[in-house]
Structure formats: structure tokens, C-alpha cells
């Protein structure tokens, strides 16, 4: 009986360590994601392909979520006289997936099956309309005045 109790205790400890590791992974992802990223998200609006995107992730202290901005740049003055479409975003890391709500468009996207490092962020993005695309972003240290955009 003592051997069974010991095995049961060890199984419980192993199970608990796995569940805590999952939370730590999400926290680490949110921490690394924090900042500005630029590159090609392969975004299409209408029949126009974005040239590149800039995404800013601002992490809430100690949480797996935050707010930010997502700007898609297009060739020419495509959108209401601008060469970009700007969105405020909210985001959450849950079970290693990154869930993003584009507040100004009222759309949701999910980033999954990705590689995230200090300088490069690549993987797949799935929009709520069923479109799936590979993306590749790089850490951007430029300073942006986010208030200059038409929201």
C-alpha cells in the first residue's frame, strides 16, 4: 500500500509540474512578444496585397495578454487617401497560440505553429474568414508615433 501511495504522489507531482509548465510557456511567449515587429504578414484587403506590416505588442505587467497596434501598408493611397490600414489590437497567449482581436475592423486572427526569438518571429496566421498565411517578422527598434495614424 505504501508503494502505491508513493507512486500516486509521484504521478500527482509530475502532472502538476506539466500544468505549471504550460503557464510558464505562455508567460515567456508574452514576454518575448512584447515590442514592435515588422515584416510580411501576407495580408490582403480587397484585391490589394499589403507590402508589409508593423505590429506593436504591449504586454500587461505579469500577464499573458496586452494591447497594441497593427498597421498594414499598401502601395499608393489605397485606403481613404492613406497607404495603410491601422488597427488597435488586444492579444492573449493561451496554450501557446496567440489570439489577436483587430478592434477597428472587428476581426479575430490566431497565430500558431510559430517560432519566436528575440529578433525573428515567423509562423502561420489564420484569419476569422478562414484564410491562412505564413508570415515572417523581425524585431523593429524604430520609434513610431502611433497617434499619427487615422483610426
Where do the PLM segments sit?
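Post-signal peptide N-terminal segment of mature Sec-exported envelope proteins
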Residues: 32-52, 56
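Sec-dependent bacterial lipoprotein signal peptides
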Residues: 1-22
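Bacterial Sec-dependent N-terminal signal peptides
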Residues: 16-41, 139-151
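Short, solvent-exposed aromatic-acidic interface loops
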Residues: 44-45, 69-78, 103-107, 126-130
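Short hydrophobic/aromatic-rich beta-strand segments that constitute the beta-sheet cores
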Residues: 39, 63-72, 98-102, 119-127
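Edge beta-strand at a domain terminus
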Residues: 82-97, 120, 124-151
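Acidic, glycine-rich flexible loop segments
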Residues: 95-118
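N-terminal glycine/threonine-rich, aromatic-flanked beta-hairpin/loop signature
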Residues: 48-97
